[in-house]
């Protein structure tokens, strides 16, 4: 599932796609 800001999460983990997220830092 995609939450915006480069963050994607599955049932047991989540990760950040920094190539997308860095625009919001």
Swiss-Prot record:
Disulfide bonds join 9-14. It is found in: Secreted. The keyword Secreted applies. Transmembrane segments: none annotated. The keyword Disulfide bond applies. GO terms for cellular component: extracellular region. InterPro entries: Bacteriocin_IIa, Bacteriocin_IIa_dom_sf. Keywords: Antibiotic, Antimicrobial, Bacteriocin, Disulfide bond, Secreted. Pfam families: Bacteriocin_II. One of its GO terms (biological process) is killing of cells of another organism. Bactericidal activity against a wide range of pathogenic bacteria, including Bacillus spp., Enterococcus spp., Listeria spp., Staphylococcus spp. and Streptococcus spp. Has no activity against Lactobacillus salivarius, Staphylococcus aureus, Streptococcus pyogenes and Streptococcus suis. Belongs to the bacteriocin class IIA/YGNGV family. This is Bacteriocin mutacin F-59.1. It comes from Streptococcus mutans.
